Amino acid sequence: MSDKTQNTKPVAELNVEQVKEALIEEGKKKGILTYAKIAARLAPFTLDSDQMDEYLEHVGEAGIEVSDDADDEDPDETELVKEETESFDLTDMSVPPGVKINDPVRMYLKEIGRVDLLTADEEIALAKRIEAGDIEAKGRLAEANLRLVVSIAKRYVGRGMLFLDLIQEGNMGLMKAVEKFDFNKGFKFSTYATWWIRQAITRAIADQARTIRIPVHMVETINKLIRVQRSLLQDLGRDPSPEEIGEEMDLPTEKVREILKIAQEPVSLETPIGEEDDSHLGDFIEDQDATSPSDHAAYELLKEQLEDVLDTLTDREENVLRLRFGLDDGRTRTLEEVGRVFGVTRERIRQIEAKALRKLRHPSRSKQLKDFLE
């Protein structure tokens, strides 16, 4: 167990319930919390947007005002909320470096760049119309924030999903934000929508980006472990052991090893090996189901010797054994099945088989096969 107390632990080492409770306590002391601070503190956890809304209601029920004004932040909170509150450049509809897109996507980015942004008063006016059931107002509010989706999606490029897919998932989050936005809570739509968009994208990455899907709750655990791992790396100056990570996270060592194993990404068998790129990883992995060259050679020699031995029997004896033991096609037959082939009774086939096997057990024949049985 770590000797750190719950109240002095960094946010990265607290679980989601501890962070929620800490925010409530802080809000009760000050009487106010900013939406940006709440979003930033909860950002490391994979809360879905409904859970976020539920928590905001809980904050309100505790008598805490949720503000959208960054001036309400304490100076020492600047770094904590920087990533979540930094302004998005909504005029930049360029493509992130290294991202290849086709003409339709380029046209889409150009088209949404022509849509006028909304003022705070226009947002409120649209929100009131939406509250009254105006479908057209929903479309206008969503359309005016499509740039926001693109700006957020750019931050997740390189996480295993195509840029266009990131935009599509973000747009779905935007539509949910339009449906659930409550202007009476006092914060801007873009601040509220950012959470929904980011959660839609991160959840899609968790569901789709990996070859082997990892449940969202496990993604949260993996992210927490990685944060602790990085923190220990800075403190220790080396990679921490599973035991040290487990002590810091209050988890059994075996559980830490299990999480680390789950977090591993699959490696393609087509991964190039060497400088020439003419070999691949799959070329060096043993096929456990394949017959080894030595076993194959021994099998071929055994077949040859067996053929020689069977040639010493009568045609009927040889054919009965071939059918009974499936020497030709690998399928064994019953006495009755073989009897139907030869037009005799099953008892007669049993007698022929017994006589043939006695002949094979004779030293003059069996010695040829003896070496293969050792």
Curated annotation (Swiss-Prot):
Region Sigma-70 factor domain-3, annotated ranges: 220-296
Ranges annotated as spanning the membrane: none
A GO CC term attached to the entry: cytoplasm
InterPro entries found in the cross-reference section: RNA_pol_sigma-70_dom (IPR014284), RNA_pol_sigma70 (IPR000943), RNA_pol_sigma70_r1_2 (IPR009042), RNA_pol_sigma70_r2 (IPR007627), RNA_pol_sigma70_r3 (IPR007624), RNA_pol_sigma70_r4 (IPR007630), RNA_pol_sigma_70_r1_1 (IPR007127), RNA_pol_sigma_70_r1_1_sf (IPR042189)
Domain of life: Bacteria
Region (Sigma-70 factor domain-2): 141-211
Motif Interaction with polymerase core subunit RpoC: chain residues: 165-168
Cellular compartments annotated: Cytoplasm
DNA-binding region, residues: 335-354
Predominant place of localization: cytoplasm
Example GO biological process: DNA-templated transcription initiation
MF GO annotations: DNA binding; sigma factor activity
Function: Sigma factors are initiation factors that promote the attachment of RNA polymerase to specific initiation sites and are then released. This sigma factor is the primary sigma factor during exponential growth.
Subunit structure: Interacts transiently with the RNA polymerase catalytic core.
Family: Belongs to the sigma-70 factor family. RpoD/SigA subfamily.
Protein name: RNA polymerase sigma factor SigA
Gene source species: Listeria innocua serovar 6a (strain ATCC BAA-680 / CLIP 11262)
Upper classification of the organism: Bacteria, Bacillati, Bacillota, Bacilli, Bacillales
Gene: sigA
